[in-house]
Amino acid sequence: MRVASAPSADNWRALQVVLILLSITAGSVDAIGFLRLGGLFIAHITGNLVILAAHLAADDEAPLANIISFPVFIVALAVTRLLAAGLERMHVTLLRPLLLLQFLLLTGSLALCVGGGSRPDLNAANAIVAGMLGVSAMAVQNALVQISLKESPSTCVMTTNTTRFVLDLGEILLGRSRNDGVKAGERAKRSGLAIAGFVVGCGLGAGCQAVIGLWSLVLPTGLALVALVIAVAAKLDGTQAHPCFAQRTTGKAASATKAGRHFDGL
């Protein structure tokens, strides 16, 4: 039985920074998209279903971007999973390539948006494609968290994070088990940081778009680049448990290995 080595504290901290940056990215691009691209939710993709329902109820014509955003998101997720499967077959770690793909998609969205002028036609092809590139970038971000950062909270949808955060606070307050309380505290910290990052991103995105319009997409694009640079510099390959938990897990695994060898010798 192979025993995994404990992750370094530096790598774990770098990963937390990447996750916070991704949360700010999602919050900012969602606010900018909603305010500047005709009510398009780029990160919180299911919000577009509410927008569509509202238009249908009012017997209004729904924007094309809102109509196609959900199918585009699903296709982008599927393509990302196929790409990840191909990288896995080549024994390539997934986090950094997926962060690069996200950055490139956001860059494409930024280029199309600013190329359309200060007041782009939201029904024009370039504006719609720009929005869908943003949606695809958030699909990649959602996928990389699920595939490569499995122990991490969502960086795009905060409802689950808020639920987890409050439940973990309840677990800490109940104090039924010291070990469970420590784990709940660690989960609450990660969920809380993701929530805070998203809220900060929403505020920054809303503020920037009010001043510089669609040039504000430089913010999420730049944050995605910083996250990629950190991941490359720290050689991050995916999620890792907090070092103290990893050491406990490693110790348990080593004990199990010794026990297995003992029984094999009987």
Where are these regions (language model features)?
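Alpha-helical transmembrane segments of multi-pass membrane proteins
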Residues: R2-K252, H262-L266
